[in-house]
């Protein structure tokens, strides 16, 4: 599909699929189409922080410092299969890696969206009344319960299909964030820390497709320093 960035890399174990990302323009187009939708703010958070789906769904308001423009990743929501019942029930657990617990910066646009979302959530809570189950979650069902990861995935895939954009998974927003950051010249160690990777080597291995653009940017930067405007 035209405009889709599909990169075949030797990914870490368990990640043998093609690495798929959107361009900045495609991401902007999708976010614009989500305005007013329940997915708008969680997608914006993922797209501007590189957080995993479970980390986004596990966010609590106590993890956010809106004045400082940062959030703390402390837990993740998943839905593993119960061996006794065969059901996939939402459970909270530790982030995926040892360095998964981290502090993540957020741009002003995301902070503003979260402030608006908090007000809307408070209004919805009053409408539900005493039946509202307060788990302190940033993103929850209308009754306050955690959003099932599979249901969230289905909603996201539905909106992507309707958008006319190349098909991506929610996790590909994380890949898109990292790729755009590296191509913009953000140091790989900084990106690695924001993503919660165990080490910078993992970041460079996964996103090696971004290195040529980084090298070109470095060359232009050095040339500007040496030769100035001449």
Give residue spans per PLM region:
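Short, charged phosphate-coordinating catalytic segments
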Residues: 1-2, 25-27, 44-77, 81-83, ...
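C-terminal secondary-structure termini that scaffold catalytic or DNA-interacting sites
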Residues: 3-9, 14-21, 32, 68, ...
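A generic structural signal for short hydrophobic patches within well-formed alpha-helices
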Residues: 27, 111-114
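Short, basic (Lys/Arg/His-rich) helix/loop patches that form interaction surfaces
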Residues: 28-41, 49, 104, 120-130, ...
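A broad detector of short, well-ordered amphipathic alpha-helices
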Residues: 40, 44, 176-179, 201, ...
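A short, basic/aromatic helix-end/turn motif that makes direct DNA contacts
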Residues: 58-64, 192-198, 208
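Arg/Lys-rich amphipathic alpha helix in sigma70-family domain 2
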Residues: 115-119
